């Protein structure tokens, strides 16, 4: 709460105690879109470091594709401490439109045999759940709708990719922008 939420621009007030008037339910849109937000923050490597934060011979970094089907490997090769040290010094990836290679090409597939595309799954999940388009969510949050992608990003590559995928901003899936 003290590091991750502020990295998203969220600063929560101090806890004031239980409030029974708070509605604990979540919307379909939140469960379908917001809970997937972190997928673009996943990195391809699980970094493992020794006690002095050096690269270890016994416990090399593990790619997501290799470690997904063999999570016990982390314990067999050096234990959990190298993973925790690696996580402590690994910079959080940006929340953006980019999914790493292993999420785009190897998800749920046996190593060496391909797999599914997590980005495509996230987009299709939104469509299956009938969530509204990007501009509808902007308006529901009190934001003005956008008419072109340059209003969303100043990165010309991001704008070009979004234009290619969604020439009409009004038809954009809300998971991407």
Regions found by a protein language model. Give the residues of each.
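Polyanionic, low-complexity segments and short acidic motifs
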Residues: 1-177
């Amino acid at each position: 709460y003290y590091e991750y939420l502020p990295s998203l621009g969220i600063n929560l007030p101090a806890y004031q105690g239980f409030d029974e008037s708070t509605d604990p339910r979540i919307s379909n849109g939140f469960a379908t879109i917001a809970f997937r937000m972190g997928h673009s923050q996943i990195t391809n490597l699980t970094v493992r470091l020794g006690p002095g934060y050096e690269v270890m011979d016994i416990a090399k970094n593990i790619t997501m594709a290799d470690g997904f089907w063999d999570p016990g490997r982390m314990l067999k090769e050096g234990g959990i401490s190298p993973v925790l040290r690696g996580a402590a010094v690994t910079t959080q990836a940006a929340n953006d439109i980019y999914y790493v290679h292993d999420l785009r090409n190897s998800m749920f597939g046996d190593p060496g045999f391909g797999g599914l595309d997590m980005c495509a799954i996230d987009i299709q999940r939104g469509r299956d759940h009938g969530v509204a388009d990007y501009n509808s969510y902007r308006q529901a949050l009190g934001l003005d709708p956008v008419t072109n992608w340059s209003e969303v990003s100043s990165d010309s590559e991001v704008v070009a990719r979004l234009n290619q995928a969604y020439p009409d901003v009004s038809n954009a899936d809300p998971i991407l922008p």
